[in-house]
């Protein structure tokens, strides 16, 4: 029996695909072992979203070869699409597997072990491709399952390489998604998170008569017994209409936790980024969600130091973030990415300036996050318990509310994957609130 070890880099879509590839190899008779252990095959699911991600991908490939020089080292995913020619010349890499070829991993390995040749022909991901069918029966996290529902992106934001590494939008058939989620529910998962490269585009590639979109998919999954919570991955603001929000608010399982990608609060910067909305339109989306849901958690991403971002443009973004008041913000310093339009733009911002701006927004994020959590003190809430933690020497069982606020109860055996209700009485630290059970 051959041993295989996996290492995942990057987003939740990659995590889903890594789980699916592990299960493919298990079904083919491989033993899956931890990455640090000796293996016959090392599979690194790479990321290429930034130059740093490229470097980490190369480092992990070389680390695997050093761990066992006789093992087959397999590079999979986005970095393969971005730098396949370079990887073919890398002596640490034995096999390359592009996006939309992961379902064929077992056959690719069989062929390799038969003749020890790297046949890695990378598909042109930019050409029209069908959705690559990968499936899972379980997830390493035993309370929350990430479900991939689409791949690819048609947006071509000026800073982003992903449309070139993932290709155009390809949506998964809704009946296939439903079948997988029913299976996940049957083995005990209570929460699912719908994820994709551009989740809001789900269904745009279907023929008109199919009339499937993200909202119809959510309604379908809302009916599945055993699923108590349905959480959405990152959304484009333009999907949030009054009708969309009203329909979601009627559903049994939907979590009032919305990650709306912003990137900048300045219209001039948004235009250079090729984001297809302005700050006022984004704010209107947030207002709709707050009118249709009780105290929803709204989170976002912000890029500082985008080419041409002046002090006034940054100040405009800062004012906008203060006005919206997010639960959490992921702050990124712009990373120049070869192959994107932004990499060749004039007025690149110095790294020192990016760091100063990042620090300012991180401080704002911390303040706003504390204020949002504080609203829950004294309120009755429900948390889905996930894992044991220790705070100041005391052991607790920690989970999340539907808004993704962390809560904890005193530790007891057998609480994992249980839902408990109670009152949040105090903060145990900056991130976790204490729930006194009913």
Predicted features along the sequence, with ranges:
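Proteins enriched for Cys/Gly/acidic motifs involved in redox and nucleic-acid/cofactor modification
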Residues: 1-203, 213, 243, 248, ...
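Flexible glycine-/small-residue-rich
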Residues: 8, 196, 234, 262-264, ...
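Short, solvent-exposed loop/turn segments at secondary-structure boundaries
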Residues: 53-55, 168-173, 203-209, 272-275, ...
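Conserved strand-turn element in the central/C-terminal portion of the radical SAM core barrel
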Residues: 156, 160-167, 229-238, 264-275, ...
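Radical SAM/AdoMet-radical enzyme domain recognition
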Residues: 186, 215-216, 220-229, 241-300
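Hydrophobic, well-ordered secondary-structure elements that form the walls
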Residues: 260, 301, 321, 329, ...
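Contiguous mid-protein beta-loop-alpha structural module that forms a pocket-lining wall or clamp
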Residues: 309, 324-326
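Terminal RNA-binding accessory module
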Residues: 344-438
């Amino acid at each position: 029996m051959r041993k295989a070890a996996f290492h995942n880099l990057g987003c939740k879509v990659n995590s889903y695909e890594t789980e699916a590839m592990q299960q493919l190899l298990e079904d083919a008779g491989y033993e899956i072992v931890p990455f640090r252990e000796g293996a016959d095959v090392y599979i690194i699911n790479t990321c290429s979203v930034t130059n740093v991600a490229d470097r980490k991908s190369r480092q992990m490939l070389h680390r695997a070869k050093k761990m066992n020089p006789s093992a087959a080292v397999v590079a999979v995913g986005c970095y393969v699409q971005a730098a396949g020619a370079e990887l073919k010349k890398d002596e640490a890499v034995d096999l390359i597997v592009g996006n939309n070829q992961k379902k064929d991993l077992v056959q690719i390995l069989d062929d390799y072990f038969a003749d020890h040749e790297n046949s890695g022909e990378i598909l042109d991901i930019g050409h029209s491709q069908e959705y690559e069918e990968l499936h899972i029966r379980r997830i390493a996290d035993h309370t929350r399952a990430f479900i991939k529902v689409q791949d690819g992106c048609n947006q071509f934001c000026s800073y982003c390489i992903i449309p070139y590494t993932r290709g155009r939008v390809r949506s998964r058939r809704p009946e296939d998604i439903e079948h997988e989620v029913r299976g996940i529910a049957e083995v005990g998962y209570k929460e699912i998170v719908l994820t994709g490269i551009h989740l809001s585009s789900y269904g745009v590639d279907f023929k008109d008569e199919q009339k499937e979109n993200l909202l119809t998919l959510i309604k379908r999954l809302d009916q599945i017994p055993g699923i108590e919570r349905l959480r959405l991955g990152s959304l484009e603001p333009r999907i949030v209409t009054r009708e969309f929000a009203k329909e979601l608010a009627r559903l049994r399982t939907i979590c009032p936790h919305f990650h709306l990608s912003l990137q900048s609060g300045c219209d001039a910067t948004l235009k250079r980024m090729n984001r297809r909305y302005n700050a006022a339109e984004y704010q209107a989306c947030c207002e709709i969600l707050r009118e249709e849901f009780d105290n929803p958690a709204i989170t976002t991403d912000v890029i500082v130091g985008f080419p041409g971002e002046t002090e006034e443009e940054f100040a405009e973004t800062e004012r906008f973030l203060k006005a919206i008041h997010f639960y959490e913000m992921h702050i990124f310093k712009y990373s120049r990415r070869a192959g994107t339009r932004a990499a060749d733009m004039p007025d690149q911002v110095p790294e020192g300036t990016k760091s100063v701006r990042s620090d300012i927004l991180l401080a704002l994020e911390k303040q706003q996050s504390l204020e949002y959590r504080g609203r829950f003190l004294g309120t009755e809430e429900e948390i889905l318990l996930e894992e044991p933690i220790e705070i100041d020497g005391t052991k607790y069982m920690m989970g999340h509310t539907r808004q993704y606020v962390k809560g904890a109860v005193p530790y007891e055996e057998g609480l994992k994957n249980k839902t408990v209700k109670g009152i949040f009485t105090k903060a145990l630290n900056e991130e976790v609130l204490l729930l006194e059970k009913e």
